[in-house]
Amino acid sequence: MKRAIFTFYNLSIDEEIVRLQSEVLKKLNKTADFLPLCSQTHGEEVIHPQGVEYGFNELFNKGYDTVMLLDVDCIPLNQYALEYTFDQAEKGKLIGNAQIGAHLQNPEHMYAAPSTFCLSRQMFEEFDKMTFMPDHRNADTCGFYTLEAEKRGKEVEFYMPTHFQRRPRNHVWDLGQGRGEYGIGTTYSNHLGVNMFYHLFETRLNIYNSLFYDKCDELLK
C-alpha cells in the first residue's frame, strides 16, 4: 500500500509549530510519505477546507492508496498511532479524532475531524470522490464522509478525548451524551485505551503554542 500523510497551513502559522510537527513525524513515521502543503498566503486568502480538498484529490490522483490528514498542530504520540490508523483505514474503516460542530443542525453528531482523518482511495472512489468542504449547516470540514459512511453502514472509528491541558477561552468543548470533553492540548485515545494523537487547537491565536513545543520536545527526547 502506498501511504501519505499531509498537513495544510499558510504563512501566518508559527514556523516553530511547523518545524516541530515535521520533526516528530520524521521520528515516528516509518511507512508513509510526509507531504506538508504550504499555501504561500496569509490569513483567509486560501481557507483550510480548500487546502484539504486540494490535498486529498491531488494525492489520490498521484496514486496513493491511503491518505492521512493531520492539522499542523496535531501529532502522533507514538509509531503505533500511525500504523494502527493506516491499518484500520485499509481494512475499510473511516477513522479519526472525534469532534462535533455546535453550530450545525445536529450539534451532537460526532464526526471524524480533520485534526486526524484517514481515508482509503477505495472509500474515496466508492463515495464518488465527494467533497471535503463544509456547508456549515450539515457538516464541517470532512464531515460529509462520516455522514456518508454511516448512511452506507461503513464502520467509523473515533479516537476519543481522554484529557486536555487548558480550558479554551470561552468554555470547554463537550461531545455531549457523556462522551467526554476536549480543550486546549487534547490527548485522544483509541478503544484499547492507547494514547494516539495530541491536538493543540487554536494555534492561530499564538497563545498556547508553548504547550505544543513542550509536547514535541517530550517526544523527541
Model-derived regions: residue spans:
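Conserved catalytic core of nucleotide-sugar-dependent glycosyltransferases
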Residues: 45, 75-148
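Short, high-confidence coil segments that cap the C-terminus of an alpha-helix
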Residues: 64, 90-94, 154
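C-terminal catalytic/acceptor-binding lobe
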Residues: 139-221
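N-terminal anchoring/stem segment of glycosyltransferases
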Residues: 1-65
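A structural signal for short, well-ordered beta-strand segments and their strand-loop junctions
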Residues: 35-36, 69, 94-97, 118, ...
